[in-house]
């Protein structure tokens, strides 16, 4: 069994010096879309256009819990080996949002992969598929 650890502090792994040249998505900052571990970014304009479109449709901010991940960060958080987060995917907090409205806005914005959890929704543009993080999440989402 391989154990991966990282002893860097948050200030060391999240520098505020991510270039913003060409950044056109007013509701999101490059830092929140980059890897929380090393600040690596993956620039995918079509994905960001769709995310901005979903945000515009909802008309309220939403919190990105996780977006791009480097392979080490993905392993540290227990992500799937071929996770869409290795390119670009988002986990969006459900706090303050109607889950059904958020899902519908993301679906209409051309997201195709959805993971349903009790406190967040995962959205990506990989192969079309859906899953529930837990039995409790399945019950929660099927009631909405």
What are the residue ranges of the model-derived segments?
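Extracytoplasmic cell-surface/polysaccharide-interacting catalytic and binding patches
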Residues: 1-57, 127, 138-144
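Catalytic cores and adjacent binding grooves of peptidoglycan-active enzymes
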Residues: 2-7, 81-144
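Compositionally biased, low-complexity repeat tracts
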Residues: 18, 30, 74, 109-111
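Solvent-exposed, flexible loop/coil residues
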Residues: 22, 72, 77-81, 118
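N-terminal start-of-chain detector that recognizes signal peptides
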Residues: 35-37, 62-67, 93-97
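A short linear-motif detector with a strong N-terminal bias
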Residues: 42-44, 69-73, 92-94, 100-103
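Solvent-exposed, well-ordered amphipathic alpha-helical segments
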Residues: 46, 59-61, 94-95, 125
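Extended, low-complexity, intrinsically disordered C-terminal regulatory tails
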Residues: 48-78
């Amino acid at each position: 069994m391989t154990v991966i650890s990282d002893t860097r502090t948050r200030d060391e792994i999240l520098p505020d010096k991510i270039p913003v040249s060409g950044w056109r998505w007013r509701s999101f900052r490059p830092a929140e879309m980059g890897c929380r571990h090393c600040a690596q970014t993956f620039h995918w304009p079509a994905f960001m256009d769709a995310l901005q479109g979903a945000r515009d449709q909802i008309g309220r901010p939403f919190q990105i819990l996780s977006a791009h991940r480097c392979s080490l960060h993905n392993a540290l958080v227990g992500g799937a080996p071929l996770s869409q987060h290795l390119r670009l995917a988002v986990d969006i907090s459900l706090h303050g949002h109607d889950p059904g409205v958020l899902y519908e806005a993301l679906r209409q914005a051309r997201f195709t992969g959805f993971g349903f959890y009790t406190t967040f929704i995962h959205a990506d543009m990989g192969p079309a598929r859906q899953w529930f993080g837990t039995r409790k999440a399945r019950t929660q989402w099927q009631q909405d």
